[in-house]
Amino acid sequence: MQFSPFIPILLTLRTALRHLPLFALAGVLCLPVLALLGAWLPGVDSNAPLPVLKAMAQTVLPGYLWTTLWLAIGVGVGAALLGTAAAVAVTLFDFPGRRSFEWLLLLPLAMPAYVTAYAYTDFLQFSGPLQTWARAAFGLEGRLLPEVRSLGGAVLVFVVSLYPYVYLLARAALAERIAHLMEAARMLGAPLARRIAAVALPLARPAVAAGVALALMETLADFGVTSYFGIQTFSTAIIKAWLAMDDGRVAAQLSTMLLALVLLLLWLERRSQSRLRFSARGAGGAAVSLPRALTGWPAVLAGTVCAVPVFLGFVAPVAFMLRPLAADWSVL
């Protein structure tokens, strides 16, 4: 009995020791972030980076910021629409090829975004095979397609490359956590369109937001596509400060600004979700909402919704890169 006051302390110590490896792993993972934050600490040359940052803030930094924001908005909206539409199609409907599309829609993840950018640019640019053939075949002159290496082109490349993040998480949410609620809505007489709009999509919002967050973080951290397309974003500014200006401290400070922007976006989305109590947790029951069989034009539409992302994100880039082999196998 005389040791009873120490029992809670011993139990707490035991719990802390049991989680010590997790704490150590978390500390190791935080080291890169702490290193970036250390760039703001005063040092021997503490005044050196300030004029550089002030000069960038007065000249190029606002343009970098706006371009980055527009890129993030375009990629976020596009990936959400493309990924959610594909997830709804393969989860709630049954049409020819549905089983194949369930895994085909993941193939763009195997294609790096910068490789997709190279493939589209080579095929669609002014001197590319498509415009060259069109000018020769129809007697046309000048540029026939918008410039691929632009902000809009970058948005397209990122959307078709990163939408699987949204698709994968949204499909899991629709298949595992919302089936019983969709079945309940059906038994109450709600039509299919209302069940999708009022039940499936709102409940899948946390999963869609998580997928969009993953796509945005990869977009903001990308340098290959933005550099190749000549788009001035925060990532290109960081690389320029590090390599062209040979100033690692300014690059680290710019990196913390980009990290703060990402955290702000995540916080805003988390706050908006906290005000809405719609997230379903767990399966909640054994009811299963079977996919609705589609025939005719509805089946064609559902198949098109799934086929277009696969074609743009994987089939077309691979075909563009394999095109030289069809003309000359000696390149192997």
Label each region the model flagged.
Residues 96, 190-191:
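Short coil/turn motifs that cap or connect alpha-helices
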Residues 272-305:
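Flexible interhelical linker loops that connect adjacent transmembrane helices
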Residues 9-45, 59-175, 203-223, 251-270, ...:
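Membrane-water interface segments at the C-terminal ends of transmembrane alpha-helices
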Residues 40-52, 126-139, 229-235, 276-285:
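Peri-membrane helix termini and adjoining interfacial loops of integral membrane proteins
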Residues 181:
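Helix-turn-helix DNA-binding elements, focusing on the entry/boundary residues of the two helices
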Residues 220-245:
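Glycine-rich helix-loop "coupling/hinge" segments at transmembrane-helix boundaries
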Residues 188-190, 202:
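Glycine/proline-centered hinge or cleavage motifs at structural transition points of membrane proteins
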Residues 48-57, 331-332:
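A short amphipathic helical element positioned immediately N-terminal to and/or at the very start
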